[in-house]
Amino acid sequence: MKKMVLAVCCCAALLGGCGDRYEAKSGLTPYKEEIFAMDTYMNVCAYGEQSQKAVEAASAEIQRLDELLSVTGESGDVYQLNQLGQRQVEADTLAVISRAVEVSKETDGLFDCTITPVMKLWGFRDGNFRVPSSEELAEQLAKVDGSKVHMEGNTVTLLDGVTV
């Protein structure tokens, strides 16, 4: 959990801090790296003596979380959880799923981490985009229910075929 919090803080600080104005005022040259993770391009940037080390550490953590939380990466917790329906997961995965379930409750289901079947239907997972029929949507929406995600210790259980 501490690693995840650190990664998020680093990313927020790094992603927002690479403007030309800071470089001009400080006289420091940034170390920058562009990565692709979590289905998006990211620019990681840092200034100072340890900038390269900081950027490499942040990039490695982003890649680790991407693999761990990926719906399609077969070695990750989320992929395996979706395949098995129940699984012991790493602390970072548990924290993300736990918070997602909380947000689902707080928003009365407007945000729901079990939307995966609908995402697949529209082609967001494999890039084969299409507009599904009303019948297909109704069938897949029946599989969306954040209340069917249960956690006990570090074990997550997905009931009735829901996926995250």
Label each PLM-derived region with a short phrase.
Residues 5-6, 11-164:
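A contiguous, well-ordered beta/alpha segment that forms the leading edge of an enzyme domain
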